[in-house]
Amino acid sequence: MKYHWIGHFKEGTSDKVWGLIRLTDYPRYNDYAAVWGRRGRALQTKIHSDIDAWDADKLCNKKEDKGYTVIDLARLDQVYPEFEEDLQKTAVWAMLKV
């Protein structure tokens, strides 16, 4: 499992994250899990099967266009300390769906 992109959006009462996790490791097409949620709520997922890196980047660019800021793992730990734990639960579930 590999992070492809993590974004954070905070405006008014909205405080949420959106991320894309690479579930497979093939040369061209891969499976990704989009993971999102508001802080303090359960994360949701959507599997994107057999897409290339360009399509994965396109999904991330759409989030940036909507106001999400790219963050690294250190910043993620500050804005959503439970994310790693919640992600592990969600990612295991997502991999079982692939």
Region spans (language model):
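Interaction modules related to DNA damage response and DNA replication/repair
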Residues: G12-S14
